[in-house]
Amino acid sequence: EALPEEFDVSTMQKTKIQKGMSSTMSVNRNIDNLMNQLEETFSQRLLRMIDERGMTDSEAYTKAYVDRRHFSKIRKDVNYVPNKKTVLAFTIALELSLDEAKDLLASAGFALSRSSKTDIIVAYFLQNKIYDMFEINDVLDAYGQPVF
């Protein structure tokens, strides 16, 4: 799978040792440059999206059926990554567009898959701007999938 266009690895080519400078130093410098391009973590992105929507934390996690202690882990640890089901629940609770949902999932290291019934169902509801968790759970259950 190709890297996104904005992820430029062309500068990461190892250089031959010249004038006593090791290729490791060159690679480290190039990796440092890439580290300066880091995107938001899942936690940072989620908290920003909650704020942008004018929601309180408790409104967001309650609507996503996430308990307070679990949300506290997300809030306190900038690098914490919940499971995919939790991320999907937040995409619905925050009433994200399909593109926003894909971005939030990607920030946690996940993607919507066409081989997953749950993903197909959630994507359908997001694409059609239907954010009723009860309705989504009914359809998930009808297709034998775990509910939120």
Locate predicted features.
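The alpha-helix within a helix-turn-helix
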Residues: I50, Y61, T91
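A short, Lys/Arg-rich alpha-helix, primarily the initiator
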Residues: S23-T56, F134-F148
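General nucleic-acid-binding
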Residues: E1-Q37
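Short C-terminal boundary/hinge segments that cap the last helix of small helical domains
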Residues: L96-F110
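Helix-turn-helix/homeodomain-like alpha-helical modules used for DNA recognition
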Residues: S107-F148
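Short, basic-rich loop-to-helix N-cap that marks the start of a DNA-contacting helix
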Residues: V78-A93
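Helix N-cap / loop-to-helix initiation motif
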Residues: T56, D67, N83, E95-E100, ...
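Short alpha-helical DNA-recognition segment
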Residues: G54-K73
